Amino acid sequence: MRKTKIVCTIGPASESEEMLEKLIKAGMNVARLNFSHGDQAEHKARIDTIRKVSKRLGKTVAILLDTKGPEIRTHNMKDGLIELEKGSEVTVSMTEVEGTPEKFSVTYENLINDVEEGSYILLDDGLIELQVKSIDKANGEVLCDVLNTGELKNKKGVNLPGVKVSLPGITDKDADDINFGISEGVDFIAASFVRRPSDVLDIRKLLEAKQNKNISIIPKIENQEGIDNIKEILEVSDGLMVARGDMGVEIPPESVPMVQKDLIRQCNKLGKPVITATQMLDSMQRNPRATRAEASDVANAIYDGTDAVMLSGETAAGQYPEEAVKTMRNIAVSAEAAQDYKKLLSDRTKLVETSLVNAIGVSVAHTALNLNVKAIVAATESGSTARTISKYRPQSDIIAVTPNAETARQCALVWGIFPVVKEGRKTTDALLNNAVATAVETERVQNGDLIIITAGVPTGEKGTTNMMKLHLVGDELAKGQGIGRSSVVGKTLVVKDASELEGKDLSESIIVTSSVDETLVPYIENAIGLITEENGITSPSAIIGLEKGIPTVVGVENATSEIQSDVLITVDANQGKIFEGYANVL
């Protein structure tokens, strides 16, 4: 199972039912709606289509609303474009004017109070660089030197690297879009241009005003101020997006890789999901294959510890949206296969602080590694059980069984979790049986697999994860008293006396009989297992099993009548149990 989650931006290239079905089948876990483009009616139609297709496919797909944020842009230029020449001077006005090579204006009138002489102003993703020469507050104008030649078009982005701006945390448009998202039941809000904790709390207040506790807030870190305040921001957030686009303009590009690693590490420490975004497979907007550098970029983000990787223009407006998702999926699977999960668990155990909450998670992860369990099945109301286990990055699949669709969608962003919605159970036994049955239904486990079940007891209460149980999936045919500590898999041979065994090849047979006498001993020596109805550690069956080192189970009631010949079974002498088919016993 792929563990790294894939976030896809939905736009004109991917909004159709046909293409959304392809993206979901290719591996999309979260659909991102970019509210910097389009109106609410367009996004409403996309939300409806995403839900329709995901329901039809029986797949869990979460929806992430990405706000436009308090960005700064230029106003319009004369004839739509002006050219700024290196070495010339240009005035940036706080009052809207039609842009010329001598003067243009910006949408943020308080810029004049935030910059100082020597500050840099970057235009159009940093393609044009200006340096503040003088400030005329009386006339609301900032005179700048043009440091490189370039064309400036309408409504281009403006960045102020190293400048603490006094922009609001969210704009009126953001608030309106967030309220729209609440009414539509989106799962995540990605907050653009977050600089300080108060920016996140402004959104939290909007959610609380609507009594909404289900939507998670994912701040996007895109500037130096956000980087500087990251610890405080994470304290009030539910996750993080490493938005490398504007970040690479606001800080030196060579600093981005190390900042990415640090931001991911801090999220890993707290067990909060982190998305790595921007230009991951950028060339696939135009080409059907990714570059080698892009493949390395995606893989290294996974090695850094990201929960999810994101596609932007590749799926929103690119020519090859399906191919981009498949490429992302294949890179993730390949990178995950190369992970040293033993070292990863050791590193995570040191990184994540010890607490009662984390105790069950680390115990489950260590047990899963040591016993090579097939899957970890977490019965969870809120998703916290599965998320706690995910912190430790177990190699085993994490199957989160929850009665809440909202919880399942929240888990869609978290590394390694495969969420399944299933009606809850009131008793512990029913809870465990339901968890096992659901795991089998996913086809990620099958009869004979060893799994770990974890849950909270009593059932139905949030935050009570306190139980871990090893469970062998499969039908238990019978049980008795085990002789020895080994196990064996083979075909049954039910016999009444030694005459039935003459001339038979017993090298792969498990003999099933009522009792053992001296005529059977020579044949038992050539068999690989023994099951008998006679009781006791001192019975002939037990003695021959011990002497010959053959996995043996004695005291199995009605063994000769209830077990058929030529049936593949597993004899677990350690537990005294007999399973149908192959079972991965300890």
Swiss-Prot record:
Entry-linked Pfam families: PEP-utilizers, PK, PK_C
Enzyme Commission designation: 2.7.1.40
Domain of life from the UniProt record: Bacteria
Binding site for ATP: 34-37, 73, 156
Record SUPFAM superfamilies: Phosphoenolpyruvate/pyruvate domain, Phosphohistidine domain, PK beta-barrel domain-like, PK C-terminal domain-like
InterPro entries, alphabetized: PEP-util_enz_mobile_dom, Phosphohistidine_dom_sf, Pyr_Knase, Pyrv/PenolPyrv_kinase-like_dom, Pyrv_kinase-like_dom_sf, Pyrv_Knase-like_insert_dom_sf, Pyrv_Knase_AS, Pyrv_Knase_brl
Transition state stabilizer, annotated site positions: 220
4Fe-4S keyword on record: no
Binding residues for Mg(2+): 222, 246
Residues that, per the record, bind K(+): 34, 36, 66-67
Positions contributing to substrate binding: 32, 245-246, 278
Record carries keyword Transferase: yes
Pathway in which this enzyme or protein is active: Carbohydrate degradation; glycolysis; pyruvate from D-glyceraldehyde 3-phosphate: step 5/5
Name assigned to this protein: Pyruvate kinase
